[in-house]
């Protein structure tokens, strides 16, 4: 459970940073990022969701570390994280 909390925290942090940097309110970006983070590879993040950003070597090392945390999650836990974030983002739409 500790790894999934860390993964969620880092994902939310990256989302906030990217959101502030672009000045966009882009929930789709975050969902794409999270989906790729949970079921894809770091390379897929760099080529897709983060493709327009300059990802430095330290950030790439952090993504590799996240991948090792993610690999330890059971598939049902990954799915539940996605469901939770969809719920949170959906509640923001209604606010």
Curated annotation (Swiss-Prot):
Subcellular localization(s) per the UniProt record: Secreted
InterPro entries per record: Secretoglobin (IPR016126), Secretoglobin_1C-like (IPR043215), Secretoglobin_sf (IPR035960)
Pfam families, per the entry: Uteroglobin (PF01099)
PANTHER family in the cross-refs: SECRETOGLOBIN FAMILY 1 MEMBER, SECRETOGLOBIN FAMILY 1C MEMBER 1-RELATED
Protein name, per record: Secretoglobin family 1C member 2
Upper classification of the organism: Eukaryota, Metazoa, Chordata, Craniata, Vertebrata
Keywords: Secreted, Signal
Family, per entry: Belongs to the secretoglobin family.
Signal peptide positions (record): 1-23
Location (main, coarse): secreted
A Gene Ontology cellular-component term: extracellular region
UniProt superkingdom: Eukaryota
């Amino acid at each position: 459970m500790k790894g999934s909390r860390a993964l969620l925290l880092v994902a939310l942090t990256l989302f906030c940073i990217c959101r502030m940097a672009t000045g966009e309110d882009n929930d789709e970006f975050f969902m794409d990022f999270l989906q790729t983070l949970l079921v894809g590879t770091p390379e897929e993040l760099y080529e897709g969701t983060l493709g327009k950003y300059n990802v430095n070597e330290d950030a790439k090392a952090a993504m590799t570390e996240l991948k090792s945390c993610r690999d330890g999650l059971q598939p049902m836990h990954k799915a539940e994280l996605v469901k939770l974030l969809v719920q949170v983002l959906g509640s923001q739409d209604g606010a």
